[in-house]
Swiss-Prot record:
Subunit text: Monomer.
Pathway the protein contributes to: Glycan biosynthesis; glycogen biosynthesis
Catalysed transformations (reactions): Transfers a segment of a (1->4)-alpha-D-glucan chain to a primary hydroxy group in a similar glucan chain
InterPro entries: A-amylase/branching_C (IPR006048), Branching_enzy (IPR037439), GlgB (IPR006407), GlgB_N (IPR054169), GlgB_N_E_set_prok (IPR044143), Glyco_hydro_13_cat_dom (IPR006047), Glyco_hydro_13_N (IPR004193), Glyco_hydro_b (IPR013780)
Gene3D superfamilies the record matches: Glycosidases (3.20.20.80), Golgi alpha-mannosidase II (2.60.40.1180), Immunoglobulins (2.60.40.10)
Signal peptide from the UniProt entry: none
Listed GO MF terms: 1,4-alpha-glucan branching enzyme activity; cation binding; hydrolase activity, hydrolyzing O-glycosyl compounds
Family named by the database record: Belongs to the glycosyl hydrolase 13 family. GlgB subfamily.
A UniProt-annotated Pfam family: GlgB_N
The protein, known as: 1,4-alpha-glucan branching enzyme GlgB
Keywords attached to this entry: Carbohydrate metabolism, Glycogen biosynthesis, Glycogen metabolism, Glycosyltransferase, Transferase
Gene for this chain: glgB
Keyword Glycosyltransferase assigned: yes
Length: 738
């Protein structure tokens, strides 16, 4: 080999890890009639260029003792052809033969990059992150990261000793995306990005925002995921997916078991660690299916650094948390769920993200993912950054993560957290602490557009058919579940937070005072059909001093459980889909604690087993009775029979389906049994008592009507027929024409 020039300024910039364009000097370059190869390999003793067969093409001379080598290849190729060579590197303890990362051309398609910049989530999914693949027949990993404000980005990891000088990346300047193909590494490699801000200042090492796998906290590196293995995963849920695509979920029975997977099951013999996905598949799935739930909903499982956030402060929205094992484990979990007849819903948090130094905040030295103005970009309640969803690339990044959960893991639903905080610019902000929109209003127009884009994408051809979207939205914002074509947000369902707050406030009252709060239980029907609702008894209501569901109830232990059973009977008969957080199904006394399991030992007590049995029976009856779900979102599916008996705290209503089938629910929310309570009924003859929450099997007194009653032609409550009922104390009855 002949000598080859290596500019001193380039050498200094490379050694300082501040060169803005490493491909301009590293790798093969045509200089006159020769091909010059330059490489930066700090710590290398000797470097030679070798042919594919192993023959030595020549020596690269060390031009700087810090690790800069250069030399000219013998000219034996056509002009314009990429030179074929490998580097044979002598390290102090080993020899390595590897392709030159700087001998490869551009990696990402310009059209895909342009679509990403325009806000296309499919392009974000295709372009960004780490992908093990072959380039020109060479195996390796393609890295790509969006960081338009950085002056230099390197990928670092175990494969280069975490040395930012070794693998500086190429900037695709119009789009702000940095890329590099690193040969001869693969899935399982740990890595991060080393960035310099525009002023040259070194930033903390950053995890990959689009990493599909991470280290388990408290470690923070990204890991190259085996996406090929995920894409080749042996799914056997084709029948489930076909049925899901044709299912009208709004008019189907939906009962959701909300689970914090980190604490639902812990392994005490191994330091109280969380269960793996495979362990949860063996325990949680048969339990939830056996309880009659239609879905499990998981609090956020995208990797999150702080366990005390319960997952709601995620930094890696594409990566299932390593707390539970590798990504393939989550795929197996979903596969098991579908085989058992359970859908899987995941919580998703596009509103905000935490301030951890390895995360998204000031990612490239600028406010990249967040707003620059703290009045828009900092959340005062949670002390987190607010995503700038109005920036096209940020919106594409977030929606791409939702698509990834749907495509890679076959999830059946995505529940969007904290929607209200996104919709209002003054959410939790005092006057002067927020920025009005362009019209001077408080509505966040960018978030509205983002949420519509999210729903249109998840309901469009880019996503698998039948994926449902849920909004945790706590205000009276109109049209949350209206189609985007009708100026709605486009969600399938909205959590009915108002119903939850009102009904729990009623149940907290001593029964003697409930007559003064009667409207709290009836008010929900004023707006019950304005949206498609989920009735949520979620984790948020059993934490931070609010008390568990059972602990909220007044009275002694028996009365508390009786109140809760009656409430469950009322809730499962009420219009709206059902959601119950873990522990509530057996009336645990303690609040949710993220570092402890539910109080499973309470199931040794018959009273708590009785509540559990009731929830199971409610789920099964709810699924079997079309009147209880077929018209959940339509006024024709509900009518009050007794809505004004505040003196007795008695409520009664009828549920119907569009075929005329009906079921009547009657609730007595006092501890006083009511004998000969005449109730108007919509049909004559024999009525079966299909459910009594005071049944002995549920821990009650077994008072009731002996399983049946007769409706005679005696007018009452606006109906032609009526029956004299015995109403058990603190109980709900379900009646159906026999």
């Amino acid at each position: 080999m002949t000598d080859a020039p290596f500019d001193r300024a380039d050498i200094d910039a490379l050694l300082d890890a501040r060169h803005p364009d490493p491909f301009a000097c590293l790798g093969p370059h045509r200089v006159g009639d020769a091909t010059v190869v330059r490489t930066l390999l700090p710590g290398a003793l000797r470097v030679r260029a070798i042919a594919a067969g192993g023959g030595v093409l020549g020596e690269l001379r060390q031009v700087d003792p810090a690790g800069c080598f250069a030399g000219a290849l013998p000219d034996g190729r056509e002009r314009g052809e990429r030179p074929r060579y490998r580097l044979s590197i002598d390290w102090p303890d080993a020899r390595q033969d590897v392709e030159d990362a700087y001998a490869f051309g551009t990696l990402l398609d310009e059209d895909a990059l342009a679509r990403f910049a325009a806000g296309d989530p499919r392009a974000a999914l295709a372009c960004l992150g780490a992908r093990a693949l072959d380039m020109d027949g060479v195996p390796g990993v393609r890295f790509a990261v969006w960081a338009p404000g950085a002056s230099r980005v390197s990928v670092v990891g175990d494969f280069n000793g975490w040395d930012a000088r070794r693998h500086p990346m190429r900037l695709r300047r119009p789009w702000g995306v940095w890329e590099l193909f690193v040969p001869r590494i693969g899935a399982g490699e740990r890595y991060k990005f080393a960035l310099r801000a525009r002023d040259g200042a070194a930033l903390p090492l950053k995890a990959d925002p689009c990493a599909c796998r991470t280290e388990a906290p408290p470690r923070t590196a990204s890991i190259v995921a085996d996406l090929d293995a995920l894409e080749r995963f042996g799914w056997h849920d084709d029948a489930w997916l076909r049925a899901r695509a044709s299912l009208d979920l709004a008019h189907a029975p939906v009962s959701i078991y909300e689970v914090h997977p980190e604490s639902w099951l812990r392994v005490a013999a191994e330091g109280n660690r969380s269960a793996t996905w495979d362990e949860l598949a063996q325990r949680l799935i048969p339990y939830a299916a056996g309880m009659g739930f239609s879905h499990v909903e998981l609090t956020p499982i995208a990797e999150y650094p702080f366990g005390g956030s319960w997952g709601y402060q995620s930094l890696s929205p594409f990566a299932p948390s390593a707390r539970f094992g590798p990504p393939e484990g989550f795929a197996r979990f979903v596969e098991h769920a579908h085989a058992a007849g359970l859908g899987v819903i995941v919580d998703w948090v596009p509103a905000h993200f935490p301030d951890d130094p390895h995360g998204l905040g000031k990612f490239d030295g600028t406010a990249l993912f967040e707003h620059a103005d703290p009045r828009e970009g900092w959340h005062p309640d949670w002390h987190t950054h607010v995503f700038n969803v109005g920036r096209r690339e940020v919106g594409a990044f977030l929606i791409a993560s939702a698509l990834a959960w749907a495509h890679r893991y076959h999830v059946d639903g995505i529940r969007v957290d904290a929607v209200a905080s996104m919709l209002y610019r003054d959410y939790s902000r005092a006057a002067g602490e927020w920025v009005p929109n362009v019209y001077g209003g408080r509505e966040n127009l960018e978030s509205i557009a983002f949420l519509k884009h999210f729903n249109d994408t998840l309901h469009g051809p880019a996503a698998p058919p039948g994926v449902a979207t849920f909004a945790e939205e706590s205000t009276a914002w109109p049209g949350v579940t209206a189609p985007t074509a009708e100026h709605g947000l486009g969600f399938d369902f909205k959590w009915n937070m108002g119903w939850m707050h009102d009904t729990l406030a009623y149940l907290r009252e001593d029964p003697i005072h409930r007559r003064h709060h009667h409207d709290r239980l009836t008010f929900g029907l004023v707006y019950a059909f304005s949206e498609r609702f989920v009735l949520p008894l979620s984790h948020d209501e059993v934490v931070h001093g609010k008390g568990s569901l059972a602990a909220k109830m007044p009275g002694d232990a028996w009365q508390r459980l009786a109140n809760l059973r009656a409430y469950f009977g009322f809730m499962w008969a009420h219009p709206g889909k059902k959601l119950l957080f873990m522990g509530g199904e057996f009336a645990q006394w303690g609040e949710f604690a993220h570092d402890a399991t539910p109080q499973w030992d309470l199931l040794d007590a018959p009273a708590h087993r009785g509540v559990q049995r009731l929830v199971r029976d409610l789920n099964r009856l709810h699924a079997a009775e079309p009147a209880l779900h077929a018209l959940d979102d339509r006024p024709a599916g509900f009518a009050w029979l007794v809505g004004d008996d505040r003196n007795n705290s008695v409520f009664a209503f009828v549920r119907r389906d569009d075929a005329g089938r009906m079921l009547v629910a009657v609730c007595n929310f006092t501890p006083v049994p009511r004998t000969d309570y005449r109730l108007g009924l919509p049909a004559p003859g024999r009525w079966a008592e299909v459910l009594n929450t005071d049944g002995a099997a549920y821990g009650g007194t077994d008072a009731g009507n002996g399983g049946a009653l007769q409706a005679d032609e005696i007018p009452a409550h606006g109906e032609r027929w009526s029956a004299a009922l015995r109403l058990p104390p603190l109980a709900t009855l379900w009646l159906r024409p026999a």
